[in-house]
Structure formats: C-alpha cells, structure tokens
C-alpha cells in the first residue's frame, strides 16, 4: 500500500502493543513557554510537499514541481503575510517535489521527485537576500546510464513487460539523506528500493531491491553510519555499511512495534533516540539499550490522525499530522510531555522544519527560542516563534 492510500486514516488503536509514555502535565517551570504564528506564506494553486532550511534561506518544494527559495530575513520582518515577489523559483520534472536536503555549506540542494528522478542544484550567493540556483545534474546521470547499459546483467525486470537498469527508481522518490561526511547520498522510493549515490560524481554505487515489502516513506542516518528506513509495511529497518566494502550495506536489525504504516523518522543529534510516526497517529520512541540495539520504550499519543512529518531540535520533538496540528514534545528523563499544540492550518501538515533561533534576545541558559516552519495541504506555510524555558 502506498502512503497516499493510508496516510489519512484515523485509528485510535495506535500501536497497541507499546505502552504510552507519561502524559502527565508538564512540570510547573515548563508551563511558562509560549508560541505564536508570526507569518503565513499564502500558497496559490499547489501545496508545499517538502521544505528544508539552507543557511539564510527557506527552500520549499511544491506539488506542482516548483522549488522556491525565500530569504529568512524577509520572514523576520513585521509582516504577517510576506510577499513572495522576490522569491527565486525553478521548476523541474513532473509532479510533486517529494523531498529536499541541503549540504552543510548550503551550496547544494538535492531534490527528490514524483517523476522518479533526483535533481542536484547549486546555490550561489548573490547578495544578503538573493541566491542564484543552477541545475547541476539529474540522477541517474546520463554517463551512469550509458555505462550500465553496456554492462552485462545491469537490466532488471521492474514490471511484467518492462525492464530498466538497476540504477533507476521506478516510482516516486520519497526521501533523501546525506551521510555525515556528505560523500554519500541515500534515496528511498515507493518502488521499495534503497539506493546509494557517490556525491563526487553522483554515480549510483548500490541498489537494495525489496528493502521493504511495501513503499518506503522515510529515511534517517546516524553519525556512526547506521541507516534507518521506514515503510508502509509497518517496519523500520536498520542498515550498516560493511567495513570490508564501503559500497555495500547489509541489514542489521528490523524494528517491528508499529501496527500501521510508518511515514516519518527523526533521530536525536547523538543518535541514541529514534522517533517514528505512524499512520495510526502514534509516535514510537526507540532508544539504544544494552548491546547497542534499538528498543521501543513507549509511544507518544495525542494526534488523532496520521503522523506525516517529524523534526528534532535539541531536546524538542516536533510532529506534524493529518489532524491539521503540530505538537511540540519534550523528554525529561524517561517521561515525555506535550508542551504545545499549534493550530491554524486548514489541512494536513505535510512537512516541517525547525531550527534554533540564534538571533533571539530571549535565548538564555534557562530558555530556548525556536523557529518552526510548517507546510500544509491547505497550500499555506506558517512560521511559528516558540519560546520554551528549560
């Protein structure tokens, strides 16, 4: 079953085999946080299907194939509905831009598309408020495709009457991730494959066929090289690169506590905690226990419909849902608290990105200010400022 077939199902029987983590009210000192929507970026005829923060810019991908760059400085102005007159817009492929990632130096943007392709873009700094974006490559590249056509056994059966080389995705590319050293790009697809690309020349190094039994919806990478993939088959699989062969990954674990398809993943910075969002509205919390293996320690419940996206900033977890809300969670020891429910979208929240607000005067050793960007099927992007005491 593809994500679109089950994404918005509402089931209150959420991952019933996993106990709920503490749902008690937050400690008194955490009750003094506040949040507000500081801007709404009005959409036109397409919804935002993906977004990523890249330095001083918010990069968004839409359901009508557009990639748009907007200066974060323009969003900090006192304007609840900022103009998009100065946005940089490019269009590529057919259908939605399913996922976006940026390099650590913010010079590369990589986009995943519904037309089965991956595209690489170069960002050049023009001024404080403007960037120039250039299309560098479409994956698989022409040279890679030509070489594979000449190689024996490079063509595989993808449908009853269709063959193609193993470097091609044959369905929507649903998620992307860069390795810590940014030498490898990982892509997953509704075609159930996990592919690995070398970023120096964007050659496809490896393709794991049938990595799952259904569409793969999300991917997350830890600093130690573990690769987590999540699927509509209800499973999360863990892959590790073999030390003897940097090109080859092997399955090292399968996490099977979800009762419904898994749509989203997020890892804490130290890689010790993994969050997974299910179509039943539950968020499972996985923690590395003795022996170095992930174990489910509980579930966060509160959303009434599918979890569609997750993000982590410091100790905070942000979750976007088909119930049109974003929730903010914080873990304290082994307990978790829902600190806020952000309401205002008129459609499912499809994608989110959060970041520490370095420019806020409210940041102290006892408080944290974050900016959260949420994209919805209502075609709007909302910008939220969140102040939370520690």
Question: Could you tell me what each predicted segment is?
Answer:
Residues 61-64, 112-115, 188-191, 229-235, ...:
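Conserved strand-to-loop turn within each blade of WD40 beta-propeller repeats
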Residues 67-71, 118-122, 188, 194-198, ...:
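WD40-repeat beta-propellers
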Residues 350-355, 360-390:
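Blade-level signature of beta-propeller repeat domains, shared across WD40, Kelch, NHL, RCC1
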Residues 36-39, 78, 85-88, 134-137, ...:
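A structural motif specific to WD40 beta-propellers
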Residues 1-57, 68, 76-77, 126-166, ...:
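Intrinsically disordered, low-complexity acidic/Ser/Thr/Pro-rich linker and tail segments
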Residues 34, 41-48, 90-97, 141-147, ...:
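WD40/WD-repeat beta-propeller blade N-cap
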Residues 51-56, 101-106, 177-183, 219-225, ...:
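Loop/turn segments within WD40 beta-propeller blades
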Residues 73-78, 122-131, 240-246, 287-292, ...:
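Short loop/turn segments immediately following beta-strands, especially the blade-tip
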